[in-house]
Amino acid sequence: MTTSWYTADDCRLEDLRALVEQQTDRADYPHASDVEGNVLGYDARSLGNSRDVQAELARALMAGPGIVVLRGAFEPAVVDRATGVFFDLIAEQKAAGVVGGDHFAQPGANDRIWNALDKFALRDPRAFADYYANDTLALICSAWLGTGYQLTSQVNVVNPGGRAQVAHRDYHLGFMSQEQAQRYPAHVHQLSPVLTLQGAVAHVDMPVETGPTLYLPHSQKYGPGYLAFHQPEFTSYFEANHVQLPLAKGDAVFFNPALLHGAGTNHSTDVRRMANLLQVSSAFGRAMETVDRTAMCAALYPVLRSYEGSIENVVAASAEGYAFPTNLDKDQPIGGLAPPTQAELVLRAVAEKWADARFAEALHAQQDRRV
C-alpha cells in the first residue's frame, strides 16, 4: 500500500497481471494434497484440526492463491437431506410468485434462497444440526476469523442455460460502486477482506460444463481491486485468464472475499447446479443478512439436548456469539467485561440439561434485555 486513498487511476492491469501470473508452490503448503490451476486442494477427511493446519489455511487465503478446495468436506447423505429441504423451499417460493434476485446476475436467471440459514433451521432442525456440525467448516472459519464468527447462507441454483456472473469481489466493499468504494481509505480496503470468509458447498456433482465458479488466484493481493473490477479491461482479463475447477457433491470451496470470482455459465442440459453459498462474518463485523437467531436456537434446542454430533459447531453456526451491541442498562456485564452471549446460554442449557420451557424462557428474556 503506497497511497492513503485509491482512485480509478491507480488501477493498472499490469500490476494485477504481475500478481496473478505467479505460480502456487505446493511445497509451501505441506498439508495440501494437490495444486490444480494454481488452486490448493486439501483432503478434508484427513486434514486434522491443528493450529499448524489453521495457520496454513489462513496463509493460503491471505498471502497464497486466496482460495482452497476442501474435498469431501461434507458427507453426501447429509448434503442430500439439506438439498431436499432447499428444493422444497424453492418450490414454495415459486408457488408464491417470489422471484429471487442476484447481486451479479440477471434477476430470475437462477433460483435463490435468501436467509437460507434460519429457514433451514426452522424447517428441519435435525438436518440443520447434522449439516452445520461439520468440523471442516468450523476449522476454516476459525482459522480465518477466530471465535465468535457468524454464519449466513444463501442457496443458489443455476439452471441449465443460466449465464455467468460478472467478475467481482465480495462483501463489504465488493457490494459498492466504484465511486462508493473510493470514499474509503486504502487501509479499509485491506481491512474489508479479513472481516468475512466466503465459501460454497457443492450440493451436486459439478463438472466444468455445469459452470462451477470462476476464480482468478492471487487476485486478492491487488490493492485497488475493489475499484478495478468495475473496469472493462479488468473484466476482459478475468474472462481470458480465470480458473474453473470441477467439484464433487460435498466438496467445499473457501476463498478470500477480495478474490476476483463469479459463477460460471451452466452449459449442461439437465443439471440444476446447486451450491450453498456461505458468508461467514467476523464477530467484529456484521453480516449482510439479518437472521432470527433466537428463533433458530429455540427450534434447535430440543435436537441439541440429545445430539451426538458436535454441539459446539452447531451453536457456532446458529447462535449469536458476540455480546455486543446490547442495552447495557438492562443487560449488564455481571462478573465480567461483557454479558453472556446467546451461544453461551445455549451451551450452558445443554450442559445443565434444562427443560425446553426453561430454556425458551431464558432465551427470550436474554433477547429482551438486548433491546
Question: Model-derived features: where do they sit?
Answer:
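Flexible loop/turn segments at secondary-structure boundaries
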Residues: 76-78, 159-160, 207-209, 222-223, ...
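Short conserved micro-motifs at the rims of enzyme active sites and ligand-binding pockets
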Residues: 81, 226-227, 265-267, 286-292, ...
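Catalytic core of non-heme Fe(II) oxygenases with the double-stranded beta-helix
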Residues: 139-140, 165-166, 173-237, 242, ...
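Charged, cofactor-coupling segments
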Residues: 281-308, 315-329, 366-370
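Non-heme Fe(II)-dependent double-stranded beta-helix
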Residues: 10, 23-67, 71-178
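Fe(II)/2-oxoglutarate
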Residues: 1-63, 314-325, 329-371
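Active-site environment of non-heme Fe oxygenases that use a 2-His-1-carboxylate facial triad
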Residues: 3, 7, 44, 49, ...
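Catalytic core of Fe(II)/2-oxoglutarate
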Residues: 229-302
